[in-house]
Amino acid sequence: MKYRTFGRTNWKVSEIGYGMWGMAEWSGSDDDESLQSLQLSVDLGCTFFDTAWGYGAGKSEGLLGQIIRANPGKKLYTATKMPPKNFKWPARREYTLDDCFPPDHIEEYVNRSLKNAGLDSFDLMQFHTWEDKWLEDDRGIRKMIELKEQGLFHAIGISLNRWEPWNGIKAVKSGLIDSVQVIYNIFDQNPKDELFPACREMNVAVIARVPFDEGTLTG
């Protein structure tokens, strides 16, 4: 396994991470098989695991907590995402911060995710949908900074809408976030135009979502 520095956090994470969406009560999913798969990835050197409350209403977060506790001697990095209050993906232009991430909702779901996983803190907490215009109402990001300072998580990230890499550039350039998750593979390379240069400039980590196009590129 090769490792990379995760932006300005300076974490040394495996360049191949584990996305846990498929472990959220999908048809045919099995908890024992999921845990075996997670453990094999740890044994092979994977150290970065990405989940979300929206993956089975916390089901996937619970599995992540189990694999963390099963490997107490290893530093495994935990990333999860808060759902929008209206539970609608992706975000739309007309959605306001209060529709999706009012401060009380953020605090509630950060604590729900911690309880689901049985962890005291996450390494990375992400907005599961994002609109750059939400920066105009800083209550959401300020609540995240407050919870980060309380030690509930250690870095802040955003997960961008499909085909909208430009819709996170303001957040990246604000200096308020530590990572951005965006679709990037041989079919969709738009993030290279503006988003990736902004991330390099601000030392913001990039998480490539569906790098194999949800299995299309694996044969």
For the regions a protein language model found, what residue spans apply to each?
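N-terminal binding-site loop/beta-alpha segment at the start of enzyme catalytic domains
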Residues: M1-L76
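Generic structural signal for well-ordered alpha-helices
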Residues: Y3, L38, E61, G65, ...
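Conserved, mostly hydrophobic/aromatic
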Residues: F6, Y18, S34, S41, ...
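Short, acidic/polar
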Residues: S29-S41, D99-G118, R162-A171
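Beta/alpha (TIM)-barrel catalytic core signal, keyed to glycine-rich beta->alpha loops juxtaposed to Asp/Glu
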Residues: E33, A57, T129-G219
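A structural motif
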Residues: C46, L119-F122, F153, I177
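Surface-exposed, active-site-proximal loop segments in enzymatic domains
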Residues: N86-C100
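Active-site groove signature of glycoside hydrolases
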Residues: L114-K133
